[in-house]
Amino acid sequence: MADAATIAKLEEGFKKLEAATDCKSLLKKYLSKSIFDSLKAKKTGLGATLLDVIQSGVENLDSGVGIYAPDAEAYSLFAPLFDPIIEDYHKGFKQTDKHPNKDFGDVNQFVNVDPDGKFVISTRVRCGRSLEGYPFNPCLTEAQYKEMEEKVSSTLSGLEGELKGTYYPLAGMTKEVQQKLIDDHFLFKEGDRFLQAANACRYWPVGRGIYHNDNKTFLVWCNEEDHLRIISMQMGGDLGQVYRRLVSAVNDIEKRVPFSHHDRLGFLTFCPTNLGTTIRASVHIKLPKLAANREKLEEVAARYSLQVRGTRGEHTEAEGGVYDISNKRRMGLTEFQAVKEMQDGILELIKIEKEMA
């Protein structure tokens, strides 16, 4: 049972949400009085309550989603709130649906989408993973952060070949190393106000760190938003090479540390928007002609379930007609399908851009 002080805070938060008529978050849309009353006293085995789930969305009324999972059990215990939000965000992933088993598919189906190097500046594929037996950020103790970092860094130090590299802990990092990682755009900063409000940044920078290979084409973030963010990237448009590198890394790491997986939701992450495959495959791409015809760009993007962002990610402008374009769907399809849909969409965009001469 949640304690009286927590329930009082929840009641206050619920009132604030109800009064916020201009709030458009999915939390506001789906947290009815009856759902609220049925969940407000519940507590997971690790001590997480509904307050941990909704506090970021209560504090930041301009949130798009507004909820996070404090631990794996939260997805089941607070399912009456999570499930409709997941269905709404992951268009059509119904509450009766089951995410398919992991399937990276035939990795040789992926190609260089821009062999002439005229359009695609860089290509990146990332996925998120959580370590089994540990809660997500808000419930982690300082000792657990240290223990996880130890596990992750020793696991990564066993990687070989192209993936071989170095782990840099954020705690006690020298100014030189810090600057080098900033110059490479590898360093992540302490979380934004949405993550801060979700208590995702406690004991910062304890237990946080960055691993990268010598070629700087493979990167792992430890305890940023998720326990692990595994990233494969390089200049140019060779999606095949980027995808194959990611797959071999994930398979290798998985042999050494068990990941949190849910029968219905797939791989578990802190934010429900990343569930399922957890995969985001993206390119930085120059499309000057389509940039001048946003309607056409959006139409093709919608057809292939692509998300179009500005050059520097969410909420930014496209500088010089350069967009960050990625797959939108992460749930209810396999890893292979998610990346294949993105590849097909990018090939189509390049074809249209060429034809618009």
Swiss-Prot record:
It catalyses: L-arginine + ATP = N(omega)-phospho-L-arginine + ADP + H(+). GO terms for cellular component: extracellular space. Pfam families: ATP-gua_Ptrans, ATP-gua_PtransN. Keywords: Allergen, ATP-binding, Glycoprotein, Kinase, Nucleotide-binding, Transferase. It comes from the Eukaryota. Gene3D superfamilies: ATP:guanido phosphotransferase, N-terminal domain, Glutamine synthetase/guanido kinase, catalytic domain. Glycosylated. Its EC number is 2.7.3.3. Disulfide bonds: none annotated. Stable at pH 4.0-8.0. Catalyzes the reversible transfer of high energy ATP gamma-phosphate group to L-arginine. This is Arginine kinase Pro c 2.0101. It comes from Procambarus clarkii.
